[in-house]
């Protein structure tokens, strides 16, 4: 299978997830950054908005985003209203809490939105690949990998 990655989705806008999104944007690739809706805000994208804004100023230096205009490569959204954004992505990188049950819930939620040949990756440091792939359809299992970006991603 030949696969050319043109657009990436990163799910999880914490320090590592937003850092991965910045790394991708720094390479002039389009990236979608998604996270949950903040419970304490009327803005459904508060978490990802804050993460994107902080990419210019995180410490230690250098900040994750090399140049301010690279932020234009990042589209933000949330996991309630913006799942359709996943349909455009060739690679989906999950960077959420290290709890198997929560990861499985997320995978089940996003599977209907995956492109037929999209690669799905978990940026885990503790969970085995076979456990992550449990109960996934066979056509997804064959495209599921583990990535491991260190903190901070650069």
Curated annotation (Swiss-Prot):
GO BP terms in the entry: fatty acid metabolic process
SUPFAM superfamilies documented for this protein: NAD(P)-binding Rossmann-fold domains
Superkingdom of origin organism: Bacteria
Covalent S-S links between cysteines: none
Molecular functions (GO terms): NAD+ binding; oxidoreductase activity
Protein name per the record: Putative uncharacterized protein RC0842
Organism per entry: Rickettsia conorii (strain ATCC VR-613 / Malish 7)
């Amino acid at each position: 299978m030949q696969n050319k990655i043109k657009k990436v989705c990163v799910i999880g806008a914490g320090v590592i997830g937003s850092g991965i999104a910045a790394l991708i944007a720094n390479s002039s690739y389009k990236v979608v950054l998604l996270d949950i809706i903040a419970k304490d805000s009327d803005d459904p994208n508060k978490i990802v908005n804050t993460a994107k804004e902080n990419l210019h100023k995180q410490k230690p230096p250098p900040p994750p985003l090399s140049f301010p205009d690279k932020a234009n490569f990042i589209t933000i959204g949330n996991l309630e209203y913006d799942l359709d954004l996943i349909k455009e992505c060739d690679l989906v990188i999950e960077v959420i809490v290290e709890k198997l049950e929560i990861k499985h819930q997320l995978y089940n939620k996003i599977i209907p939105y995956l492109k037929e040949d999209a690669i799905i990756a978990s940026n885990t440091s503790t969970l085995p690949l076979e456990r992550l792939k449990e109960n996934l359809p066979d056509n997804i299992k064959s495209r599921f990998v583990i990535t491991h970006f260190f903190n901070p991603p650069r």
